[in-house]
Amino acid sequence: MSITSSMFDSIKSALAADNESSKSGIADILKTEVGNTYTVRLLPFGKDPKKTFFHFYQHGWNSFATGQYTSALSLQTFGERDPIAEERFKILRTGSDEEKEKAKAIMRSEKWLVNIYVVNDPVSPENNGKIKVLRYGKQIHNIIMDAIEGEDSADFGPRIFDLGPNGVNFRVKVEKQGDYPTYVSSKFA
């Protein structure tokens, strides 16, 4: 099979489109800074409400070669074997002391993604009124779960997804605890 000019152009266009869409995906994530409170509304995924939240695992580490932070999606997200986790545990069990120290630097974290409507972004007001993606960890997940099926469910429940006047805002409060941000003071209001 020989490749034609139109086939090559199609391939080139598809790659360019993939490249552009991957750039916009990162730009769509709401960036938060310590010392600020962001007001958002959670958006349900209308086509398939079961897919409102995307739950995933990732590995992250500072590269020993460049010093840059690097992350990789864990295949455990999709219920598959994870070669990064397997190699890390193998090294921790049987590796040299130097290898064990390097393996300890690889951290696995649990995260979620949800679409949000930005009511107030104090750092980037140009985000106000736009749809973004909130990437969050266990602290915010616990607050959301409490509003859905925990102690606060009687007060909030389905209202956390209601964009109308009966809906509630989610106030994402970013504070500093040690060297890391904490979100424990975030709440629905």
Regions found by a protein language model. Give the residues of each.
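Elongated alpha-helical scaffolds
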Residues: 162-176
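OB-fold ssDNA-binding interfaces and closely related basic DNA-contact patches used
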Residues: 1-160
